Amino acid sequence: MKKNNRLIKIGLCSTFLLTLVACSQPQKKSEATRENLVSQSQSNQVYWKATYSNMNSNPSEEEVRKALAAHLDKDSVDAFFNLVNDYNNTVGSVELTGDFSTFTKTDYDVEKITNLWTPKNGDFVGTNCRINSYCLLKNSIEIPKLEKDDSLLFVDNDAIDKGKVFGAEDKDAFDILFSRVKTEATTDVKVHAAKMEQFLSQFKFNENARMLSVVVHDDLDGQSLFIGHVGILVPSEDGYLFVEKLTFEEPYQAIKFATKEDCYKYLDTKYENYTGEGLAKPFIMDNDKWVQF
């Protein structure tokens, strides 16, 4: 009986972890699971105002490209938009927006997107938040040669290899940046945030194109922290622009916020339910600093 209970617990934790790190794995949710996550999102009161685009038009692409190019090198921005356009040209018929429009929450038809993507790309699942963020930042941040823990990056690395997204050197740097970080068995976010600050302090970040990370706590195989979602925040004419790829299947989003704090609130409310019993709630990092509310 004890053995069976242990196996059940491992199975539940595995399912929870795959849901928790939303852009870590290709998501094949049941309709019931999707409805549950949507209902959680709908129950959250929105504390921010924003407009968004999936960059599915030339004007929106050029606007976002200009904002990114002001703080990032041309090669990285070009490589990023190659990924954006490949995705949008493949699945853009699934109600992806061009012009910026009012943004509260989005709900995409993952099944339709997958049915468009897979016939063209086979077993290449596409790219996620971490891959795209690294694509933008790789030439403007300094990543030290550290021992890496890429145990939760197996799908990311498989996608990188099958899509020939990065070479060996970039893949190694990617694994270091998004390594799993050891922590303690506590629900105290302050403890985990200090661990993450210590780890990320070893990197030299871009002060203008800022890496905003949602860090999640996992206890499946020891106590650890992991960047479950990430995107890039840059200044724009009207405030700030946040660029993200939601999951392997789900689209790119460029979101305009009036303030950095509004972007922090967006990430905090979107991922606040991605936790479990005995685990700390997710928290936000701005480059190497914990964002406290």
Residue ranges of model-derived segments:
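Low-complexity, Gly/Ser/Thr/Pro-rich intrinsically disordered linker/tail segments
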Residues: 242-245, 258-293
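C-terminal motif of bacterial Sec signal peptides marking the signal peptidase cleavage site
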Residues: 20-22
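A short, polar/proline- and glycine-enriched secondary-structure boundary/capping micro-motif
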Residues: 250-260
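Acidic/His-rich structured neighborhood in mature extracellular/periplasmic domains
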Residues: 72-218, 222-227, 235, 239-250
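N-terminal mature-domain "stem" immediately C-terminal to a signal peptide or N-terminal signal-anchor/transmembrane
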Residues: 30-82
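Bacterial signal peptide processing site
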Residues: 24-26
